[in-house]
Amino acid sequence: MSEERIPKRSEVPEQFKWALEDIYATDEKWAEDLQKLKAMPERIAAFKGRLSESADTLYDFMQLSDEISVLCDSLGNYAQRRSDEDTANAKYQGFLGQLMNAYVAVNSAGSFETPEIISIEEDKLQKFYEDKPELKLYKRALDKLRRKKAHILSEAEEKILALTGEMGQSPENIYSMFSDADLRFPDAVDKDGKAHQVTHGSYIPLVQSDDRVLRKSAFESMYGTFDKFRNTCAATLSAQIKAVNFYAKARKYESSLEAALDGTEVPVSVYKNLIEAVHDNMHYMYDYVALRKKLLGVDELHFYDLYTPVVPDADMKITFEEAKETVLKALAPMGEDYLAILKEGFENRWIDVYENEGKTSGAYSAGARVHPYVLLNHKDTLNCMFTLAHEMGHAIHSYLSNKNQPVVYSDYVIFVAEVASTCNEALLMQYLLKNTEDKKQRAYLINYFLEQFRTTPVSYTHLTLPTTSRV
């Protein structure tokens, strides 16, 4: 793949594209299932006012909810993944719009669900479990729902909130289209006057260069462009903040932070303890940055100096094929069953590998009923190999959860999710250090791992400052 110019989607070889045909063979098949989803409000309405009627009725409704979840999973994964592979493709933006309209209709039709379920008396619900043992499958889900009784509104109010769903998503959608589909950055120029294309995918490799002129130029290209649209970005962020605050207040939470954490069953105190722990140990970060400044030999350390390795002449170029081989070896402690799933993902196009014009930036894993999908923007760097290990950790977690858990429990919260991914990163680092004798490369790897602490717990905690008292 060329590192100079980003290819169009049509120019990317098939083996490096994810196999979305595993969900739907054609767009027409997707449209057929969309019609099924559009018919769901009528089926949902048949249960209105009846959830406390009998164990059989409640069980049948929960089964219908599972059916809708599976249908939405397929429809949502196909439409979102198609849109993410080229955000400028209006066709799949249209798919997402149609799907969101159907989602809103389904959620609106089911607005009676939570008020009716929390109104069932505890003794009666226990009798339901006795009358129909199959209903016990949903006990934890029902208990979790009933735990939120203080934040559940009337049926009419719940319906209004359901109707705001598409509007609430707008700030995020606007920013995504602006950043991934519309924004273009001027080329960066190195010390020899050579131009380098700047994209979301190429930015980090550029600021990791040992050429300080190139690093500064790439930084000014990226952040200078965003700065030109600072009012647009600020207005979009403001709209997002207003949206989350609206939903928090509507549901009678003390704050948007409490509302966000409630669904994960994580107390606000745990979140605040994390922030305090990072702040109480920031002196280590200051020592590290001071050492970085000294090793780089610069009078002033700028933001564009933070990513370049402090170990000269030890850069590691790792192709995607090499990254796959190394990750397979590094994750051997996970066992043969785990490795078999990993190989299946590598060999059967679970991964969309390279950057192309309009492709969503960054990397992620998306669980799907057929199998997970992983979006990468691979650049043959050490960081990208760690990203592969990280995202495949999420992917295999999703695969195993979907395989072994009922539909209602197959999802998981982010606090659990990151264990599977960061464990893979730790195993990869352990493997690389164990199998690297060159002192410079070992130092390079240790520097990389230190950077993960700076760019993850430290940087992310810094981003929480506006939501806490530590400003």
Predicted region positions:
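Short pre-active-site segment immediately N-terminal to the catalytic Zn-binding motif
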Residues: L375-L388
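A well-structured
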Residues: M1-D313
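Auxiliary, metal-adjacent structural segments of Zn-dependent hydrolase domains
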Residues: D313-A368, T381-L382
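Post-HEXXH active-site segment of zinc metalloproteases
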Residues: S398-V419
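Catalytic glutamate of the conserved HExxH
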Residues: T387, E391, A395
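Conserved small/polar residues in nucleotide/adenosyl-binding loops
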Residues: T461-T467
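A sensor for short, sequence-defined functional sites
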Residues: E113-I117, E121, M334-Y338, A443, ...
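Post-HExxH zinc-binding segment in Zn-dependent metallohydrolases
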Residues: Y412-D438
